[in-house]
């Protein structure tokens, strides 16, 4: 089964080494998100059926393109439900692709883009119990990895013995791979803390999902350590919620974008930025956050760019001076408007 080889999602279906690009559903399961230009992508069409079809279209394009890892969360609106209906309608069997989801945030926007609060964080045992049941009701045996959503030192989840014991039960019964995701300026600290947590003499967490991109590289060394210790490493926000695309109109970013565009040699500059993440030797899966088929196909092009000699290393050299301090990056990230 897939869970026995967590670094090789969907290997039976790809005829060899699986594509390292995955698909995240944060921008596809709800009307509002913080990606730059998200409202333009959806074009004001927020009807649930329309959004479900859009999600299915992107999932179809991902499957055709060789993607075999899909990531959702309880707080991504109807992302799990949309994924479940796609799996059923396309008759995908459990194990055909890796499915990861998350618990710890509750969606509260009521299908509104302008809600005062879009999600509420709660890492309690009660939330784990409730949301695990909800995820399993939708995804059943398709669910492979269940992750603590945005674990931080402040939330206390990594010191909550009741939660950790409950996660150990999931690990020990073999039903799920237990993972965590990280956010914020202390990602590296959290990743290393997760590496230390054990139950019954064995590491509890088998996967970690963190933000890494050309603007926010601070978790890289810790993720390399996690990879070396055998953890599945998933990269999210490789395009910095659109800040590493042409939608970033900040004049201060213009020189960096011009150089990325030059490096892309006729392709979109974001392809080079995504390829930089794909070329990390410790990154097992890099999630695309595409909300349209067109963006998904452009992201797929980065899988060939990542293998181009010298391309991504040059991008890193050029952008080193534009890399932000973690505190600055996450301050900007928190200020991105829901749209």
Positions of PLM-derived features:
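Active-site mouth loops of central-metabolism enzymes
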Residues: 32-53, 113-129, 154-157, 185, ...
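Conserved, mostly hydrophobic/aromatic
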Residues: 23, 62, 70, 83, ...
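Short, acidic/polar
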Residues: 47-62, 121-139, 186-198, 269-274
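Structural motif corresponding to the early beta-alpha repeats
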Residues: 94-125
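N-terminal binding-site loop/beta-alpha segment at the start of enzyme catalytic domains
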Residues: 1-102
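Short, well-ordered coil/turn segments that N-cap beta-strands
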Residues: 16-21, 66-69, 92-97, 140-144, ...
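Active-site groove signature of glycoside hydrolases
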Residues: 134-156
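Beta/alpha (TIM)-barrel catalytic core signal, keyed to glycine-rich beta->alpha loops juxtaposed to Asp/Glu
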Residues: 150-339
């Amino acid at each position: 089964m897939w869970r026995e080889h967590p670094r090789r999602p969907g290997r039976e279906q790809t005829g060899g080494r699986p594509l390292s690009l995955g698909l995240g559903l944060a921008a596809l399961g709800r009307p509002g998100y913080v990606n730059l230009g998200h409202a333009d992508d959806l074009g004001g069409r927020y009807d649930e059926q329309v959004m479900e079809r859009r999600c299915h279209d992107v999932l179809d394009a991902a499957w055709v393109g060789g993607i075999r890892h899909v990531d959702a969360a309880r707080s991504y609106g109807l992302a799990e439900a949309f994924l479940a209906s796609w799996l059923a309608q396309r008759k995908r069997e459990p194990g055909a692709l890796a499915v990861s989801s998350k618990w710890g945030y509750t969606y509260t926007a009521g299908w509104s883009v302008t809600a005062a609060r879009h999600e509420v964080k709660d890492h309690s045992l009660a939330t784990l119990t409730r949301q695990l049941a909800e995820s399993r009701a939708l995804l059943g045996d398709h669910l492979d990895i269940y992750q603590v959503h945005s674990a931080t030192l402040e939330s206390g989840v990594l010191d909550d013995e009741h939660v950790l014991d409950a996660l150990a039960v999931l690990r020990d019964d073999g039903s799920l791979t237990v993972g965590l995701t990280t956010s914020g300026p202390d990602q590296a600290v959290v990743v290393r803390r997760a590496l230390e947590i054990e139950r019954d003499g064995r590491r509890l967490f088998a996967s970690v999902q963190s933000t890494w991109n050309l603007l926010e590289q601070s978790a890289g060394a810790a993720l390399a350590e996690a990879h070396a210790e055998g953890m599945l490493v998933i990269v999210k926000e490789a395009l910095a919620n659109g800040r590493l695309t042409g939608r970033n109109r900040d004049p201060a970013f213009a020189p960096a974008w011009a150089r990325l565009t030059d490096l892309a040699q006729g392709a979109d500059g974001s392809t080079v930025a995504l390829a930089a993440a794909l070329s990390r030797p410790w990154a097992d899966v890099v999630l695309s956050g595409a909300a349209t088929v067109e963006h998904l196909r452009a992201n797929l092009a980065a899988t060939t760019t990542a293998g181009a000699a010298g391309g991504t290393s040059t991008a890193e050299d050029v952008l080193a001076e534009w890399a932000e301090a973690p505190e600055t990056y996450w301050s900007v990230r928190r200020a991105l408007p829901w749209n």
